[in-house]
């Protein structure tokens, strides 16, 4: 729980914006768990009479629904002091497809490759590609949040920005789902 009281969005601390994005990341991780389990044990998905791409796309339906509620409510709370809470609610709902795509993309990311060289770290040995593996998925969600950042800078949500957010989120969600392949 993070509370910040300001006179308007122009005075919104950057920490609040970062905390909102981290909260959205956490919510996307939670709803992406079924995709991760399906990636680890793909037998059930393969038994369905659907193409693998269709199954992966279907795995984004529940995350979109859940994240539309979570992101919409949190954006509504951020915009309470702005005088246009419905516009902020619409913006939060419009960013949900990007985070749902991020959840599915993260769920189907490849496992770490321990057969290659490792890097020594204070936490022990790590494979060289650990960074690229860990950001696969959340990268789409953070990119999808760019119009929200623009709204924070503007201090308001014009309705054209909601349309841009929805189009941008849909494009990123399609990219995320299409690049999330079933493991062989």
Go through the PLM ranges and name each one.
Residues 1-46, 50-184:
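Hydrophobic alpha-helical transmembrane segments of membrane proteins
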């Amino acid at each position: 729980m993070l509370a910040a009281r300001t006179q308007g969005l122009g005075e919104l601390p950057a920490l609040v914006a970062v905390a909102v994005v981290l909260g959205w990341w956490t919510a996307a991780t939670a709803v992406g768990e079924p995709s991760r389990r399906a990636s680890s044990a793909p037998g059930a998905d393969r038994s369905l009479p659907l193409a693998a791409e269709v199954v992966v796309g279907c795995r984004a339906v529940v995350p979109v629904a859940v994240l539309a509620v979570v992101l919409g409510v949190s954006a509504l709370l951020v915009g309470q002091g702005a005088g246009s809470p419905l516009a902020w609610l619409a913006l939060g709902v419009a960013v949900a497809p990007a985070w749902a795509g991020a959840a599915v993309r993260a769920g189907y990311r490849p496992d770490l490759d321990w057969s290659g060289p490792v890097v020594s770290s204070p936490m022990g040995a790590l494979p060289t590609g650990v960074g690229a593996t860990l950001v696969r998925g959340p990268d789409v969600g953070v990119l999808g949040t760019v119009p929200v950042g623009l709204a924070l800078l503007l201090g308001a949500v014009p309705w054209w920005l909601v349309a841009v957010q929805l189009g941008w989120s849909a494009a990123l969600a399609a990219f995320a789902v299409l690049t999330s392949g079933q493991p062989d």
